[in-house]
Amino acid sequence: QCDLRYPTMRPILFIMAMQSIVFCEKYDAQEIMDIGKRGDNYRVWLYFIDKKGSIPIVVDQRTIGRRSKNGVETNGLWYDLTVSKNYIEQISSLGIMVKNESRWLNAISVICTLSDIERIAAFPFIEQIKPVLGYQKRSDIEYPDISPHSRDFDYGNALEQIEQINVNELHEQGYTGSGVRILVMDTGFKLTHNALREINVIDQWDVVKDDQETANETDEESAVGQDYHGTAVLSTIAGNQLGEFIGVAFDSEFLLAKTEDVTQEIQLEEDNYVAGLEWGEENGADVVSTSLGYLDWYDYSDMDGNTAVTTIGVDIAVGLGVVCVTAAGNSGSSSWYYIIAPADADSVISVGAVWEDGAIASFSSHGPTYDGRIKPEVCARGKQTWCVNPNSNTNYSRLSGTSLACPLVAGAVALIIQARPDWSAMEVRDAIMMTASMADSASNTYGYGILNAGSAINYGVVAGSD
């Protein structure tokens, strides 16, 4: 029998129950607890339903030109509209820390508690809440102790890796990367080595700490070698010390983004990756080199080119005219031997690693993607690659990993763009794949083979047209 003293109680309880169901549909609590946990809190993406009150950002003139070349009109572009400041303010008013904003995903990443998530879900402008995927980075570079020595030619010991991908031919034609802007995203960058002191750095951003210092800033960072990996990677592109070491695209302009925090248990955060990518694109990057990858929490079925946040970010960047180059991964000898995100993107150039003689490195990750596409795209020297020793201002080392193969290809891309400035991002990618050493017999070990930069610039070019 109905209690007439509380005539509205049941409808109210029903409404509350329905609201709870709606809120829970916005997120999977177990998924957030399993994946998003960071210490006592959780790191999650908040996806918004719209961009209400958004305004367009101001992008570099180079960005406008690059987009136009790729058929993209900047005026009114949705990707340039900021995330709603009103929505962010309402989230911040709860005392929640906002880590990153993504115009491309129309989302922000935050650090919060589980009870915060319940309150956030009640906002009508929240479309979905997902955990930020992180990666507990395992050693992906082999660090042998080799005494440096040089040869009697200008490239020094870098000659072999330069000749293997036929970059020397482009250097001889005067293509050294001049006028091309490269974004390198990594752990940090120490620019005190003799081979790096003269590089043309346009801007730097530490995404982790939100400042402009990408070298080690703390004793803890120095102790764990925060900027070691990034410095070695950068040197293969930008290094220039005549007779000792010459990188692939030493005359290029550089944007440097520090997107990893190796002092933490979770070192690679996908929201930092996307933030760095958006920053580079709006600041005129023509090429992106990322020797970073994400595997934890993903299944092979997720390597379909459409699932991982970093993969989606890369596809957007390429759509805006940026050539994105990424390491295939170093899982070739493990139970998971496939490529890792964002190498599964259908627009990226993923890079495998080979020895000096062209044999595949055992650690180099394989394809195919879950939907059957060949991976990697191409290969370059990733076993005993010659680069600067980040612990010294004068010495060099031989290091191994697809992390070292990736920047060699990214540097070559810069030379191709310099030689063929009218080519779109996908035309550059096609040229690289179709002129590689195994283009007629591509496989999921080598992809389309070892890059041939000298042939790539002539792909599809009619004789006498230059």
Report the location of each language-model feature:
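Hydrophobic h-region of N-terminal signal peptides that target proteins for export
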Residues: I15-C24
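Subtilisin-like serine protease catalytic core
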Residues: E25, G39, Q128, E169-W205, ...
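Inhibitory N-terminal propeptides of secreted protease zymogens
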Residues: E25-P144
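Active-site-proximal beta-strand/loop segments in catalytic clefts of secreted hydrolases
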Residues: L46-K51, E101, C112-T113, V132, ...
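Protease zymogen maturation seam
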Residues: A122-R181, N194-R197
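C-terminal subdomain of the subtilisin-like protease fold in secreted/lumenal serine endopeptidases
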Residues: L159, N283-S289, T385, Q418-S465
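Extracellular S/T/G-rich loop segment that most often corresponds to the catalytic His/Ser-adjacent loop
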Residues: D186, W205-D210, I340-Q418, D422, ...
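Catalytic-core segments of hydrolase enzymes
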Residues: V233, Y273, L277, A285-V388, ...
